[in-house]
Amino acid sequence: MAGQGDCCVKVAVRIRPQLSKEKIEGCHICTSVTPGEPQVLLGKDKAFTYDFVFDLDTWQEQIYSTCVSKLIEGCFEGYNATVLAYGQTGAGKTYTMGTGFDTVTSEEEQGIIPRAIAHLFRGIDERKRRAQEQGVTGPEFKVSAQFLELYNEEILDLFDSTRDPDARHRRSNIKIHEDANGGIYTTGVTSRLINSQEELIQCLKQGALSRTTASTQMNVQSSRSHAIFTIHLCQMRVCAQPDLVNETVTGLPDGTAPTGTEYETLTAKFHFVDLAGSERLKRTGATGERAKEGISINCGLLALGNVISALGDQSKKVVHVPYRDSKLTRLLQDSLGGNSQTIMIACVSPSDRDFMETLNTLKYANRARNIKNKVVVNQDKTSQQISALRAEIARLQMELMEYKAGKRVIGEDGAEGYSDLFRENAMLQKENGALRLRVKAMQEAIDAINNRVTQLMSQEANLLLAKAGDGNEAIGALIQNYIREIEELRTKLLESEAMNESLRRSLSRASARNPYSLGASPAGPAFGGSPASSMEDASEVIRRAKQDLERLKKKEVRQRRKSPEKEAFKKRAKLQQENSEETDENEAEEEEEERDESGCEEEEDEDSGSEESLVDSDSDPEEKEVNFQADLADLTCEIEIKQKLIDELENSQRRLQTLKHQYEEKLILLQNKIRDTQLERDRVLQNLSTMECYTEEKANKIKADYEKRLREMNRDLQKLQAAQKEHARLLKNQSRYERELKKLQTEVAEMKKAKVALMKQMREEQQRRRLVETKRNREIAQLKKEQRRQEFQIRALESQKRQQEIVLRRKTQEVSALRRLAKPMSERVAGRVGLKPPNMDSGAEVSASTTSSEAESGARSVSSIVRQWNRKINHFLGDHPTATVNGARPARKKFQKKGASQSFSKAARLKWQSLERRIIDIVMQRMTIVNLEADMERLIKKREELFLLQEALRRKRERLQAESPEEEKGLQELAEEIEVLAANIDYINDSITDCQATIMQLEETKEELDSTDTSVVISSCSLAEARLLLDNFLKASIDKGLQVAQKEAQIRLLEGRLRQTDMTGSSQNHLLLDALREKAEAHPELQALIYNVQHENGYASTDEEVSEFSEGSFSQSFTMKGSTSHDDFKFKGEPKLSAQMKAVSAECLGPPLDSSTKNITKSLASLVEIKEDGVGFSIRDPYYRDKVSRTVSLPTRGSTFPRQSRGATDTSPLTRRKSYDRGQPIRSTDIGFTPPSSPPTRPRNDRNVFSRLTSNQSQGSALDKSDDSDSSLSEVLRGIITPIGGAKGARTAPLQCVSMAEGHTKPILCLDATDELLFTGSKDRSCKMWNLVTGQEIAALKGHPNNVVSIKYCSHSGLVFSVSSSYVKVWDIRDSAKCIRTLTSSGQVISGDACMATSTRAITSSQGEHQINQMALSPSGTMLYVASGNAVRIWELNRFQPIGKLTGHIGPVMCLTVTQTSNQHDLVVTGSKDHYVKMFQLGDCVTGTIGPTHNFEPPHYDGIECLAIQGDILFSGSRDNGIKKWDLDQQELIQQIPNAHKDWVCALAFVPGRPMLLSACRAGFIKVWNVDNFTPIGEIKGHDSPINAICTNSKHIFTASSDCRVKLWNYVPGLTPCLPRRVLAIKGRATTLP
């Protein structure tokens, strides 16, 4: 590896093979690799050069060995390393890195990380083994691993087993830090200590399977996050000792050598980075979460590209590198420009479909080659110092050795230099080297000459043989060998003679010098040895040389004698040839036997290898088929048993053979011994018989001795005979064992075959299951995508219908108002109109001190009212929208005038013109590239279509050939069509190639433009010129922004016109169907025709009778007149119900309008359209929306109950509350801008429109509807809203009760309201839905397990949420009020009604659940916040999934409220029993557990009961009877009133459209407060029982009490309240905090 210093980032490019899908769709390969060069050609001639390039057919092993293996070796030397995989999605990054463990891969397909792990542990074992062989202390290694995932800019720990896999959106606690040396490290990450390769692979597999993946259109398993797998290697090894001179170190006394073993510690970290693929959303088809992930991935890669550009661009001299723009670049700070050896592997696709992505990837990788890293060894400071000292000692020792050897000398002047001896020695060494080179050359020349001589002599001998007619190739070869041997012997002879001559000369010199040396030097024998021995040695050498010479001469003579004897020579040659052939055959046979033996051994090795592979495959943990596993286990067990038995038989057979040989040898030995003894006995007896001095005693002794020996030998013989019998028996058993062995071997072979077949079957089954699972996953992803698309269409249609409803309602209001304008006004009403001054706003200035003034009263004519109304409208438009639009014009003119007054210098003007031209060129170039990309994508799609058509035609032709091959005409036509399609495809391919070439040319031009960068012009500007250029840029930006705004306004205007046209056509269709319906009552055929038309057009009615409409249908289509609030009650099933709405609207239209009325209506409609188009302001803005609602809303009284065309009996409760008290003041919040009208004077029918519309009820619906036959008792039980007359003394109260809703049997705990609907929840375990227009209960939502403590209605989705016990029930009231889902406090989602079977009240919650105290909806309607226990759970309503928690309270959360900040983020404020109010500010990504942003202090003295927010002001009410006012921006307490009520403050709300606060207490009192100075305005006894909840809509105030009633209140402005002394005293006690 390289030493310390700069090291460039190396870049490798891998081109993946084409996919089968790409081949089927006809994609061409647009990349090519230059052979032998690391160069990629994109298109025709655009070349990119890198460090390594791998083509389509490159194996994984080649990539690893070429790129990564050296980095692993560098880690052992203490160098950091990084491997970075980059490329578009589906380019093969995960496959290259080897982190895709979802599929089984073979060893050849293993990626970089598994191979690097194996290499790492091989290196560890090798170094330990090498140290053991050398007898030194082995190195110690410690390996640890980390696996991080960067998902949506959040760092997740893939090794953290405690992390919830579904909680990916939660904020992690992992932090990134930088040490003193600039190294990057993380805290809060799990680091696992690794002991073996298998353990590390298992950790890698676990982390890889936990990584976020999903399916897109480009890739079935697409990585949705960046993954960084890090291996930390710590090594402690023995330091290498330097070579010492004479084993001493300078400075040590007496030349003692240093003792002890020194160690050094090296650390290294290896990053394996698998980046997520760069994506184009239009190609991946990602929506929802996938789109969000893709955007986050592209942002991280953009930041990485900026870092690479900053590091690699040498011309700009970039000072700042934006590492902190992304967590990805921060983590890779070491790898890019830091202490690491980095290699980047750019994975690209070869298909022309991915041409732009491939081009961008290659450019991206090309920039990375310019990055220089500063690579140093990671060594501890002690080891570094010891290494430096060792190097210094070695240098000094070398210098000392040179002084001692005389190489270095010190001159007279003290300067160091080299000695003359050293220079002479160097010169002689140089000369010696030259001579050696010359000797070597001459030796080679001699060898060549000898070869030539040998060849020539052999040719000569062959010619002689040819002339004699006895030529043979074998004889010629033999002659050549002999001649070569003769020449070699001749050369050796010459060398021996030369050596002999030199020895003779030396011997003569020694003999001549010997007498003198003996007498002169007594020490001569010590140096020269004995003269006699030297003489003997010399004579011996001479004698041997002579013998060799004579032998060589004789051999030469014999060789020469052989040449004339041709016949003898031929015979000997043939004989030698036959001998050589026999020896060759013997050698061949021996080699063949050896090959057979080696082949057998290889087969045995292969069998054993296959058995091992089968055993390994048996242990595969991926198999999950139980039957296969059981069979495989049994089979493996039997094989092992049989194998053991075979081994035992073989061992016993070997032991038997050994015993056999031993017994046979002993038997032979004993037999020989017996025979020798017998012979000796006979010889001795014979000798005794011949002896003359024979004694009987001696004979007996000898005889006894021999008899004893014979008996012993006989005993031994008997033992041996028994052993021989045993041996015979064993031999018999051996044959039986051999038969059993063969049988068992046969069974084992059969079992192995069965095992192989079973394994093959298992693999096929696994492959089939994998394919089925992949197919199902793809189908599920497609269905999910289709569902998202349908949901998007539904939302678009709902939005369109809401807009249609708004326009229709406004049209109806305009018509009704204009009809009322033509009627006379009573004097009383006209006088009340005059009470309000013209410039009176929504009521903010109403207070106790200003209500005493009275305005003059008098009658006004209708024309004066109309003129006043028009003046107010014009004044409003002039103050707000027109000023907003035109406000920029004076400023812009002033700015232009100021700019024109400034004088531009000629140089600044020229620079500005140059910059402007450059900007225009860049813009035009990019537009051209975008257009070319669009053309190329269009051509690719067209080519795919043509390919599909071509394949269909080919299949059709094949089918036609198979069915009727005689139809040549049809086949010819199909062939012609296929040829035409092929020609079209070729033309499209040529066009695609041209587009690619053009894009490449533009890219080169772009690079040229970038090379002459505008920064050069800007950097050459002076300060004044820079200011002028900045001024011009500002003007140009303003102009461009204005142009864009104008274009957007035109687009919105055209879209509005298009919507209006669609609504007009839809209205005409509905009116036509209404007219046909009236005619169809008597014609069944016409009814059927209308029914079919309705179903074809998608707006069929759900009613059983065409002429009647149900109450549910009406409630879904009808909205209160005069309301333009965004929270209006609008339903999504409007296409089916628009006809009913038109029918009602037609009844409200009355007589035709005159021309003046039509003009006014047209002006009002155009006004609304202008506001909706957003040119002046957005109508969705709360301020302008309120203004518009007060400006263009028309009076509602007198038009609430339109006249009827049919008469019937009085069954509606509205007829019983039609009369009003003449003395009661009739007030409206619209009095400031809406011209009032007198009560209707025309006669009414007994049966009004609402009773007619609600007369038809559908059976089986969950809505508890009433019909015409309902009795009065049933109506009372169902619930009704009854009006209340003015009470005595009510003129002094700030609120006036106008209606009362009754119907619950137990205390009402919660309520929610819109302009048309009221929702209430009670202790009777039910919720009720009321129609505020008809005054009736329209539905009862029952089946709750306990008290209903909270209820909310979402106007965006039309869903109702009710809380009871630990459940949140979700009701869909658009069709029939049914519970569609049940949410639990623990975060579970249950489809349908989970509490349906609950017939009795549930006192306790289920195990693991907590009581839910309150809930709140986000203003956008997408989030639901549920307070359960001491936390608030966040639900995403689009998916009905919990995504996070708000924690921080130590007591139960009793109340919460939600608002939106200026950046459209949710701001949640919670109040708890722990007396604290906490604020949570949420961001874009809401995941995990979120802590409070701020704790409001000081806390209350008791638990918090209610909260209310208006703007930046927060009010909190507590059980301590006090109310506090907080500033959300400054996050501090503004004011507090300790005893605002006598009892608990239970509810807070705001007066609609006025800066006034409403508070209600447990004693039943309602108080009104001024929001600005927090002073009381008035109070009223609202209920006799505790008030539990309060809410408002745009007109009314609703209070729910424990007296089972809901009261509807109106605010009464302009009245002086008679405040009690206690209330007035509160003003003095109000505490204002700094």
From Swiss-Prot:
The modification Phosphoserine is found at residues 580, 1145, 1163, 1212, 1238. It comes from Rattus norvegicus (Rat). Residues 521-534, 842-861 have a biased composition (Low complexity). Interacts with TRIM3; the interaction positively affects motility of KIF21B. Interacts with GABARAP and GABA(A) receptor subunits: GABRG2, GABRA1 and GABRA2. May interact with GABA(A) receptor subunits: GABRB2 and GABRB3. The keyword Oxidoreductase does not apply. Residues 924-1012 form a coiled coil. Residues 8-371 form the Kinesin motor domain. SMART domains: KISc, WD40. Expressed in brain (at protein level). WD repeats lie at residues 1303-1340, 1343-1381, 1407-1445, 1448-1490, 1499-1536, 1540-1579, 1582-1619. This is Kinesin-like protein KIF21B. Plus-end directed microtubule-dependent motor protein which displays processive activity. Is involved in regulation of microtubule dynamics, synapse function and neuronal morphology, including dendritic tree branching and spine formation. Plays a role in lerning and memory. Involved in delivery of gamma-aminobutyric acid (GABA(A)) receptor to cell surface. The keyword Repeat applies. GO terms for biological process: brain development; corpus callosum development; microtubule-based movement; regulation of postsynaptic membrane neurotransmitter receptor levels; retrograde dendritic transport. InterPro entries: KIF21A/B_hel_1, KIF21A/B_hel_2, Kinesin-like_fam, Kinesin_motor_CS, Kinesin_motor_dom, Kinesin_motor_dom_sf, P-loop_NTPase, WD40/YVTN_repeat-like_dom_sf. PANTHER family: CHROMOSOME-ASSOCIATED KINESIN KIF4A-RELATED (PTHR47969), KINESIN-LIKE PROTEIN KIF21B ISOFORM X1 (PTHR47969:SF32). Residues 521-540, 553-624, 832-861, 1194-1248 are annotated as: Disordered.
